[in-house]
Each structure stands twice: as C-alpha cells, then as structure tokens.
C-alpha cells in the first residue's frame, strides 16, 4: 500500500526574516478559531499565539493551528518558557515558529535552539505530534524539512539581554530578535514607560548591533496587530459611524 507523504510547506515568517520582505499578522491571546478564519480573509500571513500571557491550553493551540493551516496562515507561538518539554509540546501541536521570551544570555538562547531543532542542529524530541505524525515514509527527510521550516524569534527583555543581543543574534538557527518593551522598561528603571527616551535609546543601540550581526529585529519585516487593538478600533469605528452597522 502506498501513502501520500505529508510535506511541510515553506514558512513565510522564516523566509521574510531572511529576505526582509514585509509580512502581516495578528497577535491572539485567547482561543478563537472563528476569529482566525475572519482574519485570514484579510490576507494575513501569520497568526501569533501568545502562550506566555494568553489563555491557551495545548488543545487550544492545536485547534488554532488547524484553523490557521486551513487558511494558509503560518501559526507561530510565544512559549511561556524555554525548556525542552514546553517547546516540544508547542511544536508537536503544529506550531511552525517559536518565540522565546526572557532570553538573557547566549546559553539561554542555545537551550531553546537545542529544543527547537532536530539533530544535527539540535536535540528536539520526535514523537506522536501533529500535523505530520502519520504516513511519513522518509523520516530523515521529514526531520530536515522541520528544521528548514521552523522560525525562531528571540525576545530581549532585560539589561543582560540587551548586552548580549548581538552575540545571541550571531547564533545559527536564530532568525530574528524582538524586544519586550514593557519588561525592558521595568528593568531599566522606568516601569510603565515603554516609550521613555532612555528605553528607546537602549533598544535602538541593541537593534543596530543585532543588524550588524546579520539578523533583523521583528519590526524590520513584521507588521503585527494585537487582537485587542483590532477589536477596539473596529468598535470605535462602528460607534462613530452607526450607519456602518449592517442592521
């Protein structure tokens, strides 16, 4: 009996990080597959599932990935920690990109990379995860496909992270870096002031060193709206123009 071997399609996030081509997506903090379907109709490229601050459990993550894949959206997720068991479960549910928060050192980043990539690039565990856990006739090729098509974003959210940013950026397997501005503002002594000029100065300096190391920051290629911003903007528009309501 012959089987159709599933193949991973290209990861638009990973490609865009390399080419600096602009892509668009939405940040979700709650499980809402119908919302993913609505967003897909707007021509977005990816969905960002917030597994650190959001309400998702692993069943929610899998359902969101199924909805995203159905509409050709790449699902990426911010994980709550960089440990191998956590990262493995996100990847096994169908997430195509991992965003690692609170990375302070090169060793922190290497720990995450080791969990994200299969050998020889890392030591990711292989088991019964989706979406490609059946009918794999060529397992070595499948593992290579996984490595070639998983995106990795590293978040800098501390003073130590700022200092190590360029060294982290130079690591093979890191596609892009981003800044957790609220946590950075606290770490720099300006809680609740992510737009403070000193925060902006330190972020700009680190961003320039990251680019000099050959990697982009998220804002260089990714446009992302948070779902709360989308909902508030839409409701304000409807309240300002009641005739826009369909009934």
Model-derived features: where do they sit?
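Alpha-helix-loop-beta-strand connector modules within alpha/beta enzyme cores
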Residues: 58-92, 116-121, 144-148, 195-218
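Active-site mouth loops of central-metabolism enzymes
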Residues: 17-33, 76-80, 150-163, 224-232
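Short, acidic/polar
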Residues: 28-41, 81-89, 159-171
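N-terminal amphipathic alpha-helix/helix-capping segment at the start of soluble metabolic enzymes
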Residues: 1-27, 136-148, 204-212
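Conserved, mostly hydrophobic/aromatic
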Residues: 26, 39, 50, 98, ...
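Conserved anion-binding
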Residues: 85, 97-172
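Glycine-rich, proline-tolerant flexible connector loops at the mouths of alpha/beta enzymes
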Residues: 35-62, 181-197
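C-terminal alpha-helical cap/extension of soluble enzyme domains
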Residues: 124-130, 134, 150, 156-163, ...
């Amino acid at each position: 009996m012959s089987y159709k071997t599933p193949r991973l399609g290209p990861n638009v996030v990973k490609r865009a990080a390399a080419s600096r081509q602009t892509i668009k997506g939405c940040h979700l903090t709650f499980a809402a597959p119908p919302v993913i379907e609505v967003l897909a109709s707007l021509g977005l490229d990816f969905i960002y599932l917030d597994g650190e601050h959001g309400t998702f459990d692993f069943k929610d993550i899998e359902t969101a990935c199924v909805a995203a894949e159905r509409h050709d959206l790449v699902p990426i997720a911010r994980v709550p920690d960089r440990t191998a068991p956590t990262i493995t479960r996100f990847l096994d549910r169908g997430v195509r990109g991992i965003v690692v928060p609170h990375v302070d050192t090169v060793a922190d980043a290497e720990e995450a990379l080791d969990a994200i990539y299969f050998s020889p690039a890392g030591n990711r565990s292989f088991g019964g995860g989706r979406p490609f856990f059946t009918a794999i006739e060529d397992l070595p090729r499948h593992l290579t496909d996984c490595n070639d098509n998983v995106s990795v974003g590293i978040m800098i959210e501390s003073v130590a992270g700022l200092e190590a940013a360029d060294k982290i950026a130079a690591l093979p397997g890191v596609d892009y870096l981003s800044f957790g501005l609220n946590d950075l503002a606290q770490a720099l002594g300006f809680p609740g002031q992510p737009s403070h000029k000193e925060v902006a100065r330190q972020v700009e300096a680190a961003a320039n060193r990251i680019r000099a190391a050959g990697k982009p920051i998220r804002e260089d290629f990714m446009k992302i709206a948070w779902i709360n911003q989308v909902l508030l903007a839409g409701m304000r528009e409807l309240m300002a123009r009641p005739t826009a309501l369909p009934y």
